[in-house]
Amino acid sequence: NNSSQRTILEKHEVDSIVINKYINEFWTSRQRQASSIHEISYRACFKPQLPRFFINLLSEPKDIVYDPFSGRGTTVIEASLLLRNIISNDINPLSEILTYPRFFIPKLTDIRKRLDSISILDTAKADIDLSMFYHPRTEAEIVSLKTYLMSRREAGEEDNLDKWIRMVATNRLTGHSRGFFSVYTLPPNQAVSPQQQVKINRRLGQKPEYRDTHAIIIKNSDILNIRMYSSTSSSSIFDISSKLSIK
């Protein structure tokens, strides 16, 4: 909590159980002080400062922090930064895709090498018409990457580097700036239908331009704090990674 106000503690009793209520401004719009590893687009996620306050207050290093509705993983990532062991759970498969890889941050050079090794079939297309979202070359790169990742998983050869690339690519599929693979649209968790996208394109007078997916993956990997660890080994930056449980 970076607020200048002191936290107010109120106690409420419900069925003879005393419940503490903490009142304060736990983050403000000017605060960008959390770790950049949290910079993942996800609908209705809260700022890391909120779980940090309660994790510091209610637990000690090496304690277990359990999040039954993990979402993009804000709570468990923040808990691990505070040297807690964590258990993460969420019915949405996106939760694991977006959370797990951030416990095993790879070198930027390794990401480049892996991306360079992936063959791109220029004629590759999705099973459905996505021309209203992607330039043909961009779509070919996305489909080729998907084919590579699926083949690695099916062969039992998928590693943490593959999972990192999948995480970043998933988070960059659609959005509202040139930092995404698509033309201007909404992010994956607010995705519109192809018919709606056609209307958006017509209204804005836009058409999909080529986006270099590999360059975008590299750039966003850098934003997610790769630079801090570029000179270190590609092992986990968290002491708790060997005990990670994502169910």
Go through each PLM region and give its residues.
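S-adenosyl-L-methionine
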Residues: 1-61
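Short, compositionally biased low-complexity segments
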Residues: 24-25, 113-122, 134-138, 183-205
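Short, charged/polar micro-motifs that form catalytic or ligand-binding hotspots
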Residues: 37-41, 89, 132, 155
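Hydrophobic (often cysteine-bearing) scaffold residues that line and stabilize catalytic clefts
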Residues: 43, 47, 95, 138, ...
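Conserved S-adenosyl-L-methionine
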Residues: 47-50, 54-123, 206-207, 211-247
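Hydrophobic residues within well-ordered, non-membrane alpha-helices that form the packing/core
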Residues: 55, 103, 146-149, 169
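PRPP-dependent phosphoribosyltransferase catalytic core
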Residues: 109-153
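SAM-dependent nucleic-acid methyltransferase catalytic core
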Residues: 151-247
